[in-house]
């Protein structure tokens, strides 16, 4: 493992409408089978819908707040010590926490059946911005799991 080459971060892909790296990443998370233009339409429609009820001037404010609220601060990773596997709580890298938050928001939007994707994504973004919804519940579950396994924190590596 140690002899492998260093992996560098990719250059961020910004979206054309808002020139935002955050929205660009969200579009990539929504995209399936390489259909970027469809993913862009879904995300832009969701941002417009999520921003309708707010008095915010900046349309990205709602989505930024939603991702901030869904970001996990700690997570657990399995660590094998002497025949036993422990769930060890670790702090999450900022890039990973942002990625997890977006993944959770998109996945829970996809799981809402009977609703078009742009509406489901808009609802999930609105709820996450208000500290509610499935993605925030998932973050709380991850935090509870880390809290419950705090005794194994000394196994950090």
From Swiss-Prot:
Alphabetized Gene3D superfamilies for the sequence: Ribosomal protein S7 domain (1.10.455.10)
Taxonomic superkingdom: Bacteria
Keywords tagged on the record: Ribonucleoprotein, Ribosomal protein, RNA-binding, rRNA-binding, tRNA-binding
Keyword DNA repair: no
Cross-referenced SUPFAM superfamilies: Ribosomal protein S7
Stated family: Belongs to the universal ribosomal protein uS7 family.
Function summary: One of the primary rRNA binding proteins, it binds directly to 16S rRNA where it nucleates assembly of the head domain of the 30S subunit. Is located at the subunit interface close to the decoding center, probably blocks exit of the E-site tRNA.
Protein name: Small ribosomal subunit protein uS7
